[in-house]
């Protein structure tokens, strides 16, 4: 893995009402994405659905997300970024029912992953990585996806214990060889 190559943090994060943390202005995954970008000097890009999930009702948000999952939907996303120039892509998302949100697959399917190193990181409320890294590996054809080496941080920790979250991010990045 080329830890000195050009790096990108691409992520999806939900704001508004969230499970276990109430109404938030800054999404759990966004917080972790920013920490990774700050520590590694990586560029950062948000994967944003063209039609945002509802912010006022978490129940409505998860209903829509569950419908997308059941339909194997590929919801449109806002804009795009050319990943060709990047060697390493940190890919972040919340774990919803043991799956990345479907907009992550929309992003993945728009790109050629040959020769890229993809490093998943997730936020969750108790389920951990739950095999989502393996699903990312199956979707990112031609990439070296670091399954079993991703980072999983509880959303509540990201929101309410940022010093702990930052320590976890720093230790993880050091273990991967990105920081000293």
What are these regions (language model features)?
Residues 1-88, 98, 105, 167-180:
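N-terminal beta1-alpha1-beta2 submodule of the flavodoxin-like/Rossmannoid cofactor-binding fold
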Residues 2-3, 83-84, 109-115, 138-142:
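Short, conserved loop/helix-junction motifs that constitute active-site signature segments
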Residues 14-17, 50-52, 95-99, 124-128, ...:
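Solvent-exposed loop/turn segments at secondary-structure junctions
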Residues 102-106, 131-134:
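Generic recognition of short, well-ordered alpha-helical segments
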Residues 119-152, 160:
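Short, glycine-/small-residue-rich phosphate/pyrophosphate-handling segment
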Residues 144-180:
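Glycine-rich phosphate/pyrophosphate-binding loop and the adjoining helix
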Residues 23-27, 98, 126-130, 159, ...:
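Soluble non-cytosolic domains of exported or imported proteins
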């Amino acid at each position: 893995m080329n830890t000195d190559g050009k790096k990108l943090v691409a992520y999806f994060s939900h704001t508004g009402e969230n499970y276990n943390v109430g109404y938030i202005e800054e999404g759990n995954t966004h917080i972790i994405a920013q920490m990774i970008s700050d520590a590694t000097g990586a560029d950062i890009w948000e994967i944003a659905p063209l039609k945002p999930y509802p912010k006022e009702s978490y129940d409505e948000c998860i209903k829509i997300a569950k419908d997308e999952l059941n339909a194997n939907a590929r919801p449109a996303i806002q804009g795009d970024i050319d990943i060709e120039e990047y060697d390493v892509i940190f890919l972040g998302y919340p774990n919803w029912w043991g799956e990345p949100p479907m907009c992550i697959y929309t992003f993945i399917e728009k790109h050629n992953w040959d020769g890229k190193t993809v490093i998943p990181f997730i936020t969750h409320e108790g389920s951990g990585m739950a095999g989502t890294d393996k699903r990312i590996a199956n979707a990112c054809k031609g990439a070296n996806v670091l399954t079993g080496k991703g980072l999983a941080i509880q959303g509540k920790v990201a929101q309410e214990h940022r010093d702990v979250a930052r320590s976890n991010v720093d230790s993880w990045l050091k273990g991967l060889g990105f920081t000293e």
